[in-house]
Amino acid sequence: MTSVEKSDSGECGTPFVVVNIDDVGMCHGANKAYLELRRLGAVDSGSVMVPCPWFPEIAEAGALKPDLNVGIHLTLTSEKRHYRWRPLTKATPASGLIDSDGFMWRSVAELRRNAHPDAVEAEMRAQIETFLAAGLIPSHVDGHMGGVFAPEFVDRYVALSLEFKLPTLFPATIEAYGPKHNLGAVDQDSYASAAERLLNAGEKLATKALETPWHRNQPALERYQDLYHQIEPGLNFLCLHANAAGEIEAIEPDSAQIRIDEYELLKDPSFLDWADSLSLRRGSLRDARATSR
């Protein structure tokens, strides 16, 4: 595996891979895992949930270390049972952004049924501006649980990405997006139109966005070797969810161990050696953009 500095990310036979950790900023364990994995060179970037309680911790680390490679994980839902967050925009019920308890909706389906696109755009803008105001240099922008790719909001996502000149995660087709199961029915025409707008602006679309394997039916090594074997030529974005043990067991009891397994595997020297033996190029979305223009 070679770094982006040693080769470009243009169209060729060798896949370009962004090993990305989602949900940074959600809790201390997410930050701890990302900081260690980034220090080890095991990952290329992390997607930060700005509305979450532990955003200030990762913001402080990123402001001190510009090469931390953190991006904006635009967050429009709050799915945990007891550990939840609210919009930065202090939205009212009329916005459709919040449930009866004042938190973001638990699912993308509820978000789509209730949220006004103008309110969604205002919230996404607030998250981007808060991230930038913290002194962070964005490696990219993407979306938590895929909410930004819903047909009601995808044009707003693209418009803000272009306005702020952010390297943008956008799969070439919605079928190439691993977490698409969160979305429900998607209007292919609106998605294709948004993709074309990004292409015309010079952005590179992802061939695949692969997600954490949310099961423990195999040993962790086999699960992640299977995941890596799904990588294809072109730009691949791995939406991983590594988390150190501690709070996550209470926050997300049903799948906490999957996140912990992922963290332990990604820092395991034998897995790192195996991954390094693959014919892949690595870097952030910002790296991919810089080397493909």
UniProtKB/Swiss-Prot annotation:
It comes from the Bacteria. One of its GO terms (biological process) is carbohydrate metabolic process. Disulfide bonds: none annotated. Its EC number is 3.5.1.-. Keywords: Carbohydrate metabolism, Hydrolase, Magnesium, Metal-binding. The keyword Magnesium applies. One of its GO terms (molecular function) is metal ion binding. Mg(2+) binds at residues 73, 144. Its cofactor is Mg(2+). Probably catalyzes the deacetylation of acetylated carbohydrates an important step in the degradation of oligosaccharides. This is Carbohydrate deacetylase.
